[in-house]
Design a protein with these regions (language model features):
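Post-signal peptide N-terminal regions of Sec-secreted extracellular proteins
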Residues: 160-163, 175-178, 244-245, 250-266
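A small/polar (G/S/T-enriched), proline-flanked helix-loop surface module common
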Residues: 75-220
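Extracytoplasmic/secreted envelope proteins and their assembly/folding machinery
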Residues: 60-66, 164-171, 255-258, 262
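Sec/Tat-exported extracytoplasmic proteins
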Residues: 63-76, 174-181, 261-265
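N-terminal low-complexity, Pro/Thr-rich disordered segments
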Residues: 10-11, 21-64, 90-93, 100, ...
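Sec-dependent bacterial lipoprotein signal peptides
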Residues: 1-23
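Extracytoplasmic/periplasmic mature domains of Sec-exported, cell-envelope-associated bacterial proteins
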Residues: 46-79, 211, 219, 247-255
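A short, solvent-exposed beta-edge/loop patch
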Residues: 193-258
Length: 266
């Protein structure tokens, strides 16, 4: 891959990520021994009695913090990362819950929300730096420098059955919109061409997808995970720039991040 192509691919991939997150580009085990199959398939396991929502303070305590996920940098999302719910538009109304999840917007009914950015730390193995890639030292430099995954986590609490209802709404939207839709975030349109369900377990319910978007003939894969535990729902949007650039990079679900959040909600 020529240097100019590498740079162009990096810019295009960055733009695709920013369109989905506006400005926030950034398999856990079942500890209680519950039915993994049900969780993996997103089956409903709504509480028999109304659940009490975590307060804003309790939610902050349950949110991820530096040191919770090995080899990552965890920070609290700032004002520049926020996307207002009314700033997300879709061409198919049924797909709005998915567009919200991809943008870090809480699902309907949330009483409190906090957000985190979890970014892989560069490996100290002598790989190429971002500076090398910018200078155009070839495809290997691009792959080494950008083979880092960023995950945006939105953790929300709900009263009563609103948590299970929000999870169910997202599950239905993902099924209804598997064939694609167009989302416009902060005025920037993004064409989602497919949503493919992946296997994941955790919490009371968990679902995951590979979401593929398209721009100027180039496709960009991202990962989306939803986890519900009690009255809390977390969504995870993960993006790997090298994978988006078409490099031969294995881009997995952010299972370590999901597992860490699941544990903190115990």
């Amino acid at each position: 891959m020529r240097a100019t192509v590498v740079r162009r691919t990096a810019l295009a991939a960055s733009a695709a990520a920013l369109a989905l997150l506006a400005t926030a580009c950034s398999g856990s085990s079942d500890a209680d021994g519950k039915d993994d199959k049900g969780a993996a398939n997103g089956s409903s396991s709504a509480p028999k009695t109304p659940a009490k929502a975590l307060t804003a303070a309790e939610l902050e305590k349950a949110a991820l913090a530096q040191g919770d996920v090995k080899d990552t940098k965890i920070t609290k999302a700032g004002p520049a990362d926020e996307v207002p719910a009314d700033g997300v538009k879709v061409d198919k109304e049924a797909c709005l819950p998915v567009a919200h999840a991809l943008s870090g917007v809480a699902q309907e009914g949330a009483v409190a929300t906090t957000k985190r950015k979890v970014i892989d730390e560069p490996k100290a193995d002598g790989g190429k730096s971002l500076e090398d890639a910018a200078k155009g030292e070839g495809a290997d430099a691009f792959k080494d420098a950008f083979n880092l995954t960023s995950t945006f986590v939105a953790l929300s609490s709900y009263e009563g059955t609103a948590g299970p209802d929000a999870f169910a709404a997202l599950k239905k939207a993902a099924a209804d919109c598997a064939g694609g839709f167009t989302a416009t975030v902060a005025g920037t349109p993004t064409k989602v061409v497919s949503m493919t369900e992946e296997k994941i377990t955790g919490g009371d319910e968990a679902l995951a997808w590979t979401v593929t978007s398209e721009s100027d003939g180039a496709t960009t894969p991202v990962k989306l995970v939803a986890l519900r535990k009690g009255s809390s729902v977390a969504t995870f949007f993960a993006f790997n720039l090298a994978a988006a650039g078409g490099e031969n990079v294995t881009f997995e679900l952010p299972t370590a991040v999901v597992a860490a959040q699941d544990e903190k909600l115990a």
